Amino acid sequence: MMTLKEFGENLKKLNLAYAELKKKYGKPEVGKTIEVAGITWRVLDKLEKGYLVISDEFYGDSREFDDNSNNWDSSDLRNELNTDLRKKIEDSVGEGALLKFTRDLLSMDGQTEYGTCEDYVSILTVDEYRKYRKYLPNMEKWWWLITPHTTPCNNNSSWVQVVSPSGRIDYDDCCGSDGVRPICIFSSSIFESCEEDDD
């Protein structure tokens, strides 16, 4: 059985650990950055159940979207982000830290052939890029968006929208090599203590 002194020492250690975690994660503010799972994330929006964030830097090396299709739902990049990166984040802050969200795969020319899918980790659509552009400074290289240029019903399944270093939207072949800026929704629960302390 633990003595009162041992309990007090353990409580002191827990309080110190809690203070460090609180300092590390801080209270998310739209437009500001937070660090989670060793990655710096820029907060794009405060949603009903969490915070929409984007990696402030490129995640890993430039890579292809997929080797033969501009359909995000079946892409190699989607699989990588929703397995490897999801695991890294959940190993750091626990299961339930990421919220699943719906992705609209509407093409630039209005084709709905690809429909929607649900992700834990994704990349921005063209519409989201435009909506949050004020929080997204220009980067040093091209990076992928989720939006296809068109779909097979218009005889093309390879072009995908990208963002240029100057912030202009263009397109590239799905097997091109571009940067990746993952997005996800962090559950408010991982920041609750910070939010409560600030109220």
Q: Where are each of the predicted segments found?
A:
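Collagenous Gly-X-Y triple-helix signature in extracellular proteins
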Residues: 2-199
